[in-house]
Every structure is written in structure tokens, then in C-alpha cells.
């Protein structure tokens, strides 16, 4: 079946109608429709797929969000909410005859309550900005995606984001108490509550990860946690990638829940080391980063237990961070894996999938086989603790 060509005249007329309807409710700078202005919104972090929207709206208030949605609902124009555009699953990719609704301008931290350990923020607030705002209170926001310096809390809700510490501290779902949002017809609703257990269906869990299809997020109440007194990281090297994968399963089987448990293969560690000089073992076929946090006594005990498991699993080298500076240096390598890939390849396609931990080693071997079969390089980095894989397939889109 041949797909008919798009009706350019009809699309142009629809765009004109939409822009005319939105102009009365938005400032001039908050409504974009010219191609040179909307190109930055043609994709999110999954840059292999691109599509131009009819227009981009950048509201500055919840009321404007509601008015925009009412207009689009009446005109039957699809709306794609967008945070910072760092997502890797195409959740903010536009619809060609739709509107991109950017929440980037709703970026206020509305309140911080150190007694209930909560903060109320708008969706455009950066993930890391929450922790920065409460650092003086000895608190922080636990979910820490690799893009936390740029990603927004609204986008985190839409994708149910995790991060390198999600094994112990959970995903966005486990760290948010309440979400306020707007339905497609403009109705303002709230999901969740400040109570430990609110009556009725758990609609908050349904909204998490829904990519804005159920409601456009306008306000989020997040949980804050106390900073641990101490944190240390083990960097374990393996001369065989299968041993590294099996070590992950062995740590969990031993009843240990590390604060972070990440794995990178040799290609990734080499790319990262050239970029940030994290001190990684460049001869290792795979490295594991295993973090323990808590009181000094708890950390010492857990580090000893993990070291024993790693040695029994065949680790060829073990290095424990000496201080906070070295701990952050170890993590900086993992968190810069994506930009490091961008330095060595013109393009890369990042996969984002989850497998049972027991299959990590097998899958890594399969990926190595496919690299040889198809002649494409691949950097493997993932949240080993929950089996969330991020293979970065390297290519040149110009070929």
C-alpha cells in the first residue's frame, strides 16, 4: 500500500488556524511556528527519529496550559508535552499535525518543607536543581538520571525516570507524593496526596511513565531524603564480560542492595576515560561500580561483603574510593557515557530496555556477536542492579 503524499495546503491552513487560536492567550515569544524556530523541537534524546510539529507553545502559567489544551481539544489537534527533551524513548517526539507543549518555562520551586521532607515544584525545574535547593538542609532528591543536570522533573514523571541510584532509592514513582495536571479538555486534576496511603485507586502510579498521554503535569510534590553520612564506591575490574554480568547476580543473591550498581564494557570505559579521566581500568573487559552509603559502620560492613562477593566472582582488580572526590570522579565517568559516545561517532542510537539480571552476561555476549555480524560498534552501559540496558549503537548517518 502506497502512502499518499501529505496535503501541504491543508497542513498549512491547519497551522494558520491553530496559531490564530493560540495567539490571544500566549505572548508572542511563547508561540513558535516558523521552521527555523521549531527545528529544536523535532526530536528528543532519541535523535534518530525526527518530525516537525505544526507549532510549539511555551506557556508560563497553569492557566495558559489549560487554555491551550481546551483549544486543541476543540480543534482535535494532538498535543505532545515536552520537558527538557533529554528522554531516550521518543516520548517527546512531535506529531506532524500536532502541537508540542513545552513546560520549560514553568520552572519555579514553589515550596520546601524540611519537616515533612517534601518540596513542591513546577514541571520545568531541573532534577539536579531540587537537590541544590535543599542541600543546605542536609537533604536531596534521590532519583538521578545521567541527564540530571538538564532533565526536568515533569519529564521525569512522564518517563518514570530512575538513575544510577534507583536500585536502592527507587524510580520517580517511589519518590513523588502528588502530581497536579491538566486533562486534554482543560480540566485541572490532582493525583496522589500527602497522606501515606490515600483511599481509592492508585491513579498516581498510572500517570507515572504515561508520557503525558493522560495529563499534562503542572506541579509535582517530591519526597526528599537525608544525605547519608558516608558513601564509598567499589570499582571492580573483570577480564571477562561474562564474569562481570554474573557478579551482578551474585551481589543481589547475597542479599546486598547497593546504593548504586552500574556496569560498563571495555569500549565504553575507553571512550569515557578519554573524555573525563575518571581513573578507569582500560585493560578490563568490563567494570562494575558498586556504591554503599549510610553510617560509617554500615558502609564498612557492606563494602567488605561486596568485596568478598566480587572476588569470588572472579574480579581481576578492586579499587575503593578513598574520599568523596574520588567517589564523584568514578561516577562522573558513568554519567558521561553518552557524551563520550558522541565524541567518537557521528551518530549513535541508544536503546533503553530491561532484562532479568540473570541474562545480563548472555545478552552482552550476543551483542558482541551482532557487532561483528553487522560491522557496527556498540558501547554497553547499564543500570546493572535492575537490568536496565543502554546499548549505544555507533554509526554515521551520512553513510
Residue ranges of each PLM-predicted region?
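Feature of Fe-S/electron-transfer and energy-metabolism proteins
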Residues: 1-17, 36-40, 56-63, 70-74, ...
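N-terminal flexible segment immediately upstream of the FAD-binding catalytic core
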Residues: 1-70, 87-117, 146, 266-277, ...
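C-terminal substrate-recognition/cap domain of FAD-linked oxidoreductases
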Residues: 32-42, 222-226, 232-399
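ATP-grasp fold ATP-binding core
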Residues: 79-81
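Flexible glycine-/small-residue-rich
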Residues: 103, 181-183, 393-395
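FAD-binding subdomain of flavoenzyme oxidoreductases
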Residues: 108-262
